[in-house]
Amino acid sequence: MSHVQKANPGTQGDVTTKDGGQSWFYTDTVKDHFFNPKNFLKGEEDTARFNAVGKVGSPACGDELRVWMRVDPATERIVEFRWKTFGCGSAIASTSMASVMVTENGGLTLDEARKLKPQDIMERLGGLPQRKFHCSVLCDKALRDAINDYFRRSNQFDRIVAEASRLVDPVAKVTDKDIEEAVLEGAHTIE
């Protein structure tokens, strides 16, 4: 489903470009996770109970995300996942959804969570506009950074996975690094 359309007179999406040439829509699920984010770390909440932290992005680039995980060492299940972000509504919604996905039904194991892809997050949200795909990539990267941090802290260095680019769109052959670089260079769409 396309979430971008040419603006028609009298029809307005959730967001419209300054020139009025394009607008895009967010699903009700995206709106719910933006307006009512799940597992958001409020204020200066104590983070000592967490045994893993992940960070990605930079405020200078417009998006920064930090996640905290509490992993049960006996089962390696993610039993708690909290987060803070400096970013747009799509980044907030994507991270909120990811936090639900990794903790629901008793939590994913670290190996299961590492297999989570940006597409999985976007599917659960009901889609994102093309110009917002990178937001699901950000939360995916922060999650994987936290998993590596857990392995560092628990001296399981052989389980740390060096991050390489990951294929986001197999048809267009677009990787997460392609999207990040394009956004940093000012791109607004993948086209």
Report the location of each language-model feature.
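Extended low-complexity intrinsically disordered regions
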Residues: Q5-R49
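Compact, charge-rich alpha-helical regulatory domains located at protein termini
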Residues: E163-D169, K173-E191
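Intrinsic disorder at enzyme termini
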Residues: S2-P9, K18, A146-L167, L184
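Structured beta-strand/loop patches that form or line metal/cofactor-binding pockets in enzymes
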Residues: N36-I78
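Stable alpha-helical structural segments in soluble proteins, enriched in small hydrophobic residues
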Residues: M101, L138-R153
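Flexible, glycine/charged-enriched surface loops at secondary-structure junctions
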Residues: K42-E44, L110, R131, R153-R159
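Active-site- and interface-proximal helix/loop "cap" or "latch" segments in soluble metabolic
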Residues: A60-G62, R70-V137, I190
